[in-house]
Amino acid sequence: MAVPVVETNNILSHPEGGCPLQVGEGTYELKDDLHLATPPPHPSEAPIINPNPLATVPTPPTSGVKVSLVCVSPRSRTPSFISKQIVTAPPFGDGNPALVPAPVKDGLKRRKPKNNIIKSSSSFVSRVITHEVATKRLSERSPEGLFAFANINRAFQWLDLSSKQKEDPLAKILFTKAHMLCHDINEVTKSPSHIDVVMGSSAGDIIWYEPISQKYARINKNGVVCNSPVTHIKWIPGSENLFMASHANGQLVVYDKEKEDALFTPEIQDQSAEAVKASSTQPLQVLKSVNSRNQKTNPVALWKLANQRISHFAFSPDQRHLAVVLEDGSLRVMDYLKEDYYGGLICVCWSPDGKYIVTGGQDDLVTIWSFPERKIVARCQGHNSWVSAVAFDPWQCDERTYRFGSVGDDCRLLLWDFSVGMLHRPKVHQTSARQRTSMVAGSSQYGNRHRADSVGNRMRSDSQRTANTYESCDQAVRHPVEPRARTALLPPIMSKVVGTDPICWLGFQEDCIMTSSLEGHIRTWDRPREGINDKYNDQSSSTAVSASAAGSGSISGLAESTMGSL
């Protein structure tokens, strides 16, 4: 049987009149569709022939195409209402002298990784393809242009989205076997001459990459700290050196990009059998504290949350709280500065002012949770399959109204608006709420993409349990499940099928909306021009009045969750 030819070049198209997004303030027009090329397998990889869908052998972890965006000299303004309300917390590890970074000889010069990735002899990196005139393109481009970093299969691409030839990557890294599953850019250290990128792989290794100099360093090499795939990775807010990675074995690890690795041994002060057993039952096991004086090597801190995959996490705008999503359908919120835990919900994104958490997951629902009130205020029904990403649009938010979007395996992009006034408690219906069944969009061949992998861990909402008051237990507060009839239902203001493959990522920029999909399509919609609909605020307020019948309720439709004090 002939091996199919795999296209190795990206393709840029400009669909005419295709897939407009119509909302109150105007129409978002699809500007372009950048289709990333899927690289062929490395010659050393054994081809998978006729895989058995019923096989119990674990498949290699994948994540679809994720995109990290950066503008080294931002032209965009930060929405004013955000800066008014956010009070930043002290730096992570503040007070531990062992974490004070060593002084730099040239204070204006950023430290770079030591190894040249183009000339690398490492078996981890297969090869690097750079654009023949990359230096010229970098020197001639505007510093206000947008860079994008994207993963697809075993490739990692650096793209200039402000270029007319945006389909031609400035650099493409091909790894031998590992797939990059997640990546992030340091907003503190970025400049026209320096960009710090960290990326986590399916092998557990982490790459610190500086694309302008094409230097790199390998962290957690061969899983010396944690030998489990990296599921999500983010720079710690405000830090030049520290970043956090979640692993598929339920561990959260804080690394320093400039420290060497060492074989990790848990630092448990009381090694008695009773103490170890008691520690294993805690919702957050601190295997190494950020306050440890042993900070010569990685990890800086290591926490065990569960014996299952951590899917995602997000830092709150006040830089104190961390929302962590687990594969069993729960979300835990912790004060990561104090290494303390509380929480229990579904899937994660913070509002720009830190007042709300929006969640989405395997029950096909999006949920709005009030963080100050510790309760659910609305459920958002509109997806037909698992919700893969949620994000707020800060340019459409103000002190009272909020805009966010969600994407999922049903190939849909949904936009939602809600205001404080519309989130009131509805009347309790006499009839019991029927438990909703998740449906897969028949038009998508990918609807069951994740279900075979984690069907045993999938947790359904128990919508017929009655609401009770909080009850304390071992310094925790347990939130019983509330009937769905008591919870507000919020409809989307826009729902659109985008393409034919699952959508993996969603991002908002000042001038556009962007998505990426499983097969490598990066789509960009231009925002409506100013003045198209000056009456949008009036219309949205009337919409809020009509939608307010949905109301709100306390935590509902969720598995029993646990909350402790900060």
UniProtKB/Swiss-Prot annotation:
Keyword Transcription attributed: yes
Keywords of the record: Repeat, Transcription, Transcription regulation, Ubl conjugation pathway, WD repeat
One GO CC term, this protein: nucleus
Residues in WD repeats: 225-265, 305-340, 341-379, 382-426, 498-535
Bias type Polar residues, positions: 433-447
Cited Gene3D superfamilies: YVTN repeat-like/Quinoprotein amine dehydrogenase
GO biological process, one term: carbon catabolite repression of transcription
Biased composition, class Low complexity, residue ranges: 540-566
SUPFAM superfamilies noted in UniProt: WD40 repeat-like
Keyword Transcription regulation tagged: yes
Region (Disordered): 433-470, 533-566
Quaternary structure annotation from Swiss-Prot or TrEMBL: Interacts with creB.
Role: Component of the regulatory network controlling carbon source utilization through ubiquitination and deubiquitination involving creA, creB, creC, creD and acrB. Required to prevent the proteolysis of the CreB deubiquitinating enzyme in the absence of carbon catabolite repression. CreB deubiquitinating enzyme stabilized in a complex with the CreC leads to the expression of genes such as those in the proline and quinate pathways.
Family: Belongs to the WD repeat creC family.
Protein known as: Probable catabolite repression protein creC
Species the sequence originates in: Aspergillus fumigatus (strain CBS 144.89 / FGSC A1163 / CEA10) (Neosartorya fumigata)
